[in-house]
Amino acid sequence: SWHLIGHLQSNKVRHALELFDVIHSVDSLKLAERINLIADEMGLQPRILLEVNVSGEKSKSGMKPEDVEGTVSHILAECPRITLEGLMTMAPFSENKEDARPYFRKLREMRDALEKKFAIGLPRLSMGMSGDYEVAVEEGATWVRLGTVLFGERPKIKTVRPVSGEDAAAGGLDSYSGAGPTVKVLD
């Protein structure tokens, strides 16, 4: 089966439902409602996980932990085309994998409380990446994201900046008068 693990924009829901069996990144009630509506039109029953921003980092997607219970309640009552399977989170980046443990534990505890409150099973916890997946599994992860472990490090992306013809000549670059700016690669 195919899993969508990245951010999903509401205008891309139909396309995502055509391609993926499981969506790990449902980060708002509005998105869940949109998935339910489009799934109903398409005659589908998508499996989803709610993405929770356990760390509170502004750079991370996901709903606030305090919004999860209300979202689950609404999905169970008002979104019959959705199969809610669990929760997903991403821990803050750290060189020390143990730093991720409290975030993974908090997500597991949240899942356990939701199962008890709503008398439902939420068998999936999607958490942990190449640098911290062992800790995630110890804390209950059922799905991990292992890009670097499987495919290696990403290539370094070089930064480019536009330069004027004068700067280009001073920097040893040939001047360029084509369609687009002259750029200098910064290592």
Which positions does each model-derived feature cover?
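Conserved alpha/beta-domain cores
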Residues: S1-G131, V137-E139, F151
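C-terminal helical cap(s) of enzyme catalytic domains, especially alpha/beta-barrels
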Residues: V137, A141-D187
